[in-house]
Design a protein with these regions (language model features):
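Class I SAM-dependent methyltransferase SAM/SAH-binding core
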Residues: 52, 59-103
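A short SAM/SAH-binding and catalytic strip from SAM-dependent methyltransferases
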Residues: 114-128
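Short conserved loop adjoining the S-adenosyl-L-methionine
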Residues: 103-109
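Short alpha-helix
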Residues: 163-179
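Conserved beta-strand signature within the Rossmann-like core of class I S-adenosyl-L-methionine
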Residues: 143-152
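N-terminal, positively charged/glycine-rich alpha-helical extensions of SAM-dependent methyltransferases
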Residues: 1-21
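Conserved alpha-helix/loop element of class I SAM-dependent methyltransferases that forms part
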Residues: 31-47
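Core SAM-dependent methyltransferase catalytic element
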Residues: 187-201
Length: 201
């Protein structure tokens, strides 16, 4: 089974009519999802910014941002058509595109002020470390001001083999080494027992 087939199978099995968004997206609760969003945004002032949300799902991050900020330009991308359809049905103030950014990137360097991504590195694809570094390379090329994403923490007490868990220390070392001349890498921990957030600024 290819990586894309794994991703589609996982999320299509979760796509149950009438179930809440957090379940469809594979999160444990709406409260946990909100905590993740709070850390993703952090102290970034998004007013007047252009935003790319990679793996936008059903548009929940846009809903969160819209409660905090009023003037911004949001684009969400996802590889799954049913996610984009559900996001579009909400009539939110943003643009949703079904595409695989990692196969075909239509954007030029520094197109967006901020790039967010929540949850796309969670499934165990057997090459997660490589995928992470390749993805961050794309994110930082697209972003003018900041990149923010979250990962599952290898100190989680309830690990599941279908997910991949990262070491915050290793991630910080690898990214700081690669982008020492261009980005400051920060790790945020402690808001959930199984999750941490990475900021490039």
């Amino acid at each position: 089974m290819s990586h894309m087939e794994k991703i589609k199978k996982y999320y299509e099995e979760n796509n149950v009519e009438g179930y809440p968004d957090y379940y469809i997206l594979g999160w444990e609760s709406e409260a946990a999802q909100e905590l993740r969003f709070k850390q993703l945004v952090g102290d970034i002032d998004l007013n007047g910014k252009t935003i790319l949300d990679v793996g936008c799902g059903t548009g929940n991050l846009l809903e969160y941002i819209s409660r905090q900020f009023k003037t911004f330009n949001y684009t969400g991308s996802d590889v799954l058509p049913h996610m984009i359809q559900r996001a579009g049905e909400k009539k939110l103030d943003g643009k949703f595109i079904c595409m695989d950014l990692f196969k075909s990137n239509p954007y030029g360097n520094k197109t967006f002020d901020v790039v967010f991504s929540s949850g796309i590195f969670n499934l165990n694809l057997e090459n997660n470390q490589e995928f992470l570094m390749d993805a961050v390379d794309i994110f930082q090329n697209l972003a003018r001001e900041a990149v923010s994403f979250n990962l599952l923490w290898d100190k989680s007490k309830d690990k599941d083999p279908k997910y991949f868990y990262f070491s915050p220390e290793e991630v910080q070392e690898n990214l700081s080494s690669k982008y020492r001349d261009t980005w400051r890498v920060s790790i945020i921990k402690g808001y959930l027992h199984n999750d941490f957030t990475v900021h490039l600024s």
